[in-house]
C-alpha cells in the first residue's frame, strides 16, 4: 500500500491502474478512522478495482481554530487499518501541499443556497471549505466513484449537487450510517465523551426515532414537536444545538409536495462533543 503526501506520486500510481482498465474508487476522510470509515472503504471496494483513501484535516472547513488544533490525528493507526482493508493508496497531503498560496488567496468552490442552510447558517464558510477541498481531491484522484457517509446528510447533499452542477463524471454513493449496538452513530467526536457521557449519548438517536414516529401525524405542528424533542434532550443532559425537520431532497421547509422529510439533529454533550445524527422519514407512512 502506497502512503504519500505527494500529488505526482499518487497520480502516477492511479495512472498505472487506469492504463490497465481498472475502475477507481475514492474515500475522502480526515483520519481518526473508525468502523464507519472502514464501512465506506468496503462499500468502495464493491464498486471498483482500486480504492484510494485520503487523510487530510482540512483547515478551510474549520470555523474555530481550537477545533482544528485539537482534531485527533492518528495517521499510523489509520494506515494500519487501511492496509488491512486492502486499500491501494493513502493520500496524506499537508496544508502546504493542498493550499500552497495559503487560504486567503485560494480559489474556492461554493454551492449556492445549500451551503448556508441549516448547519451552514451556524458555521459560515464551513461548507465552502468542504466543497473546495473535495473538488481539489476529485481533480487529483479523478475517481469513477466516491463514497460518503449519510451521517453527514447535508454534506452528502452538497456534494451530490456540486458534482451534478459541475458535470463531474463521478458516481457519488451515500453509505448508511454505522451505529454502535446502543444506536449511537459512530463518529470521531465520540472519542471526546467521558464514560458517563457515553452512556447518555444514545439518547440522541432515541429522541430522533421518537420524532420520526410522531412526524407523519404532526406535520402541521412541527415547532411544538421540535420543542418537545429539545426538552427531552436537555433533560437527559444534552445542550440542544439544532433540530431541523425539512424536505429530504431540497433541505427546504416541508411543503404539501414533500414526500420525505429528514430530521437533522445536533447537540452538545459535555464540553467537547457536538454530536450529529439524521433520519429520513416517509411522510406518507400509515400512522399507528
Swiss-Prot record:
Stored SUPFAM superfamilies: Nucleotidylyl transferase
Reactions catalysed: (R)-pantoate + beta-alanine + ATP = (R)-pantothenate + AMP + diphosphate + H(+)
Gene3D superfamilies membership: HUPs (3.40.50.620), Pantoate-beta-alanine ligase, C-terminal domain (3.30.1300.10)
Major localisation: cytoplasm
Binding site for (R)-pantoate: 61, 155
Alphabetized CDD domains for the sequence: PanC
Positions bound to ATP: 30-37, 149-152, 178, 186-189
Keywords: ATP-binding, Cytoplasm, Ligase, Nucleotide-binding, Pantothenate biosynthesis
Active-site annotation: 37 (proton donor)
One Gene Ontology CC term in the entry: cytosol
EC number(s) stated in the UniProt entry for this protein: 6.3.2.1
Highest taxon, organism lineage: Bacteria
Location(s), subcellular: Cytoplasm
One GO MF term attached to the UniProt entry: pantoate-beta-alanine ligase activity
Additional observations: The reaction proceeds by a bi uni uni bi ping pong mechanism.
Complex formation: Homodimer.
Protein function: Catalyzes the condensation of pantoate with beta-alanine in an ATP-dependent reaction via a pantoyl-adenylate intermediate.
Family: Belongs to the pantothenate synthetase family.
Name of the protein in its database record: Pantothenate synthetase
Gene encoding the protein: panC
Amino acid at each position: 500500500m502506497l502512503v504519500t503526501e505527494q500529488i505526482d506520486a499518487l497520480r502516477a500510481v492511479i495512472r498505472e491502474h487506469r492504463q490497465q482498465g481498472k475502475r477507481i474508487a475514492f474515500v475522502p476522510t480526515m483520519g481518526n478512522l473508525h468502523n464507519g470509515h472502514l464501512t465506506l472503504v468496503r462499500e468502495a471496494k464493491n464498486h471498483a478495482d482500486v480504492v484510494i483513501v485520503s487523510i487530510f484535516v482540512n483547515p478551510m472547513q474549520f470555523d474555530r481554530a481550537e477545533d482544528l488544533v485539537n482534531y485527533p490525528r492518528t495517521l499510523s493507526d489509520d494506515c494500519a487499518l487501511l492496509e488491512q482493508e486492502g486499500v491501494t493508496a493513502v493520500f496524506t497531503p499537508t496544508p502546504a501541499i493542498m493550499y500552497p498560496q495559503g487560504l486567503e488567496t485560494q480559489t474556492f468552490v461554493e454551492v449556492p443556497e445549500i451551503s448556508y442552510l441549516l448547519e451552514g447558517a451556524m458555521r459560515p464558510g464551513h461548507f465552502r471549505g468542504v466543497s473546495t477541498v473535495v473538488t481539489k481531491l476529485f481533480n487529483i484522484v479523478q475517481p469513477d466513484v466516491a463514497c460518503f457517509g449519510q451521517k453527514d446528510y447535508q454534506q452528502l447533499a452538497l456534494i451530490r449537487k456540486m458534482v451534478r452542477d459541475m458535470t463531474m463524471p463521478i458516481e457519488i454513493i451515500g453509505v448508511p450510517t454505522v451505529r454502535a449496538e446502543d444506536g449511537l452513530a459512530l463518529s470521531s467526536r465520540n472519542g471526546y465523551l467521558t464514560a458517563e457521557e457515553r452512556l447518555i449519548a444514545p439518547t440522541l438517536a432515541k429522541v430522533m426515532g421518537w420524532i420520526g414516529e410522531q412526524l407523519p401525524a404532526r406535520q402541521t405542528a412541527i415547532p411544538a414537536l421540535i420543542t418537545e424533542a429539545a426538552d427531552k434532550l436537555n433533560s437527559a443532559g444534552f445542550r440542544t444545538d439544532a433540530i431541523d425537520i425539512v424536505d429530504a431532497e431540497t433541505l427546504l421547509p416541508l411543503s404539501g409536495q414533500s414526500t420525505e422529510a429528514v430530521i437533522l439533529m445536533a447537540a452538545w454533550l459535555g464540553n467537547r462533543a457536538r454530536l450529529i445524527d439524521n433520519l429520513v422519514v416517509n411522510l406518507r407512512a400509515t400512522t399507528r
